[in-house]
Amino acid sequence: MAILKLTPSCKDYLWGGSRLRTDFGIKSDLEPLAEAWVLSCHPDGPSYLPDGTTLADYVATHPEALGTDCAKFEQFPILTKFIDASNNLSIQVHPSNDYALKNEHQYGKTEMWYVLDCVPGAYLYYGFTHEISKEEFAERIKNNTLTEVLNAVPVHKGDCFFIPSGTLHTICQGIVVAEVQQNSNVTYRVYDYGRVGADGKPRALHIEKALDVTRRTPPQKHDFGSHLAQCEYFTVDAKKGAFDGAADEKSFVSLLITDGAGTLTCGGETVKVKKGESYFIPAGSGKYAVTGDCETLVTVV
């Protein structure tokens, strides 16, 4: 098959809402519904093919489906999510590959956010307003004044943020994003608003590790040309309306329908697609075409 529709694993983190269900058609009984892992081979939340096979099992038996550009990675390289932040996420940071492999036995996390919708006045935290010392960073975590030196950025639908590992960040309330990231689930929380988890205990913080890995400077500006984001792990583009492309021998293609509806054609197959759906086109499948009044996030390695 040249077109593989994926069903996500979902997460009920306490800051989630209901929009992934009501607005994006994600089928889940979880409440709240915080995340849908729409392209995932991660054991913490795999995506599934229509026959119930995990995407991880599929690529294990069809390694050629990944493409030659994936050969440099020891595992499936990326993970894509829908995220509905009904409340603020924790202020957090992700480690580099070197630090994460040494301390967590998995890869670090560089990621990008594409804002799908947000309430008026929405903002997020993205790095620092100015460079601070490690000592000041630790002290501000301790006395709950960290947000005074964080870079609060107003957001609007269609905005994109590239977040290299080591960047302190958080999505704040009222924002829905599509996130493309390295295939990792390592997060170090530095502040969580005093919230407690389902067990009634405060959620764990990881301050010492965060002090080790955080880049304590303003975020760098990135110019990706015509792409939303591009790095050694992924290249992401946003398409509106009809377009075509190709899944060549170098990489699989991930198509995430972020709005509207249409059709997807590849390898003699044609399927109807709509908002909230995720499709995997194996490497080497050749030309594909999307038609209709839809918006699509296209990711390759």
Which residue ranges define each predicted feature?
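Short beta-strand segments in beta-sandwich/barrel cores
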Residues: D244, G260-T265, S278
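Hydrophobic, well-ordered secondary-structure elements that form the walls
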Residues: K239, G260, G276, T296
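An exposed, glycine/acidic-rich loop-and-rim segment of catalytic or binding clefts
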Residues: I141-V149, C160-F162, L168-P218
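Short acidic-glycine-tyrosine-enriched beta hairpin
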Residues: L150-F162, G267-S285
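Short, basic/aromatic beta-hairpin or loop at an interaction surface
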Residues: E131-N143, E249-T263
